Curated annotation (Swiss-Prot):
TM stretches of this protein: 111-131
Lineage, top ranks: Eukaryota, Metazoa, Chordata, Craniata, Vertebrata
Ranges in the topological domain labelled Extracellular: 132-144
Organism encoding this protein: Mus musculus
Protein name per the record: Interferon-induced transmembrane protein 2
Annotated function: IFN-induced antiviral protein which inhibits the entry of viruses to the host cell cytoplasm, permitting endocytosis, but preventing subsequent viral fusion and release of viral contents into the cytosol. Active against multiple viruses, including influenza A virus, SARS coronavirus (SARS-CoV), Marburg virus (MARV) and Ebola virus (EBOV), Dengue virus (DNV) and West Nile virus (WNV). Can inhibit: influenza virus hemagglutinin protein-mediated viral entry, MARV and EBOV GP1,2-mediated viral entry and SARS-CoV S protein-mediated viral entry.
Any single biological process term in GO: host-mediated suppression of symbiont invasion
Amino acid sequence: MSHNSQAFLSTNAGLPPSYETIKEEYGVTELGEPSNSAVVRTTVINMPREVSVPDHVVWSLFNTLFFNACCLGFVAYAYSVKSRDRKMVGDVVGAQAYASTAKCLNISSLIFSILMVIICIIIFSTTSVVVFQSFAQRTPHSGF
């Protein structure tokens, strides 16, 4: 195996090359103002915008766990999961359709459940008043 050593000759031995040396070595020219004779071409790229489809999973889960009147919350949750699946596949139209159905079911469940709570409060308050009045009539008053 032969060892050939060649000396590296440079004017700036041991120093990094300056900007001027690099510019001359690679033939870099400075650019001036653009000439008006050049044709300017533009390229337009139409990027599809990201469509955010709300899937209402959290709302459906809330209705399923807390209200769930006539199982509407559970059905809304099923449609919400279908909407999320369609969104992951890339079917935006299908995701919007399932999300719309889930939203309608959630609204129906919420309204029905609120009405049921109001009716229960009314029934509880009227029965407690009636029971209180019946106890008041049975107990004799001790004359103070």
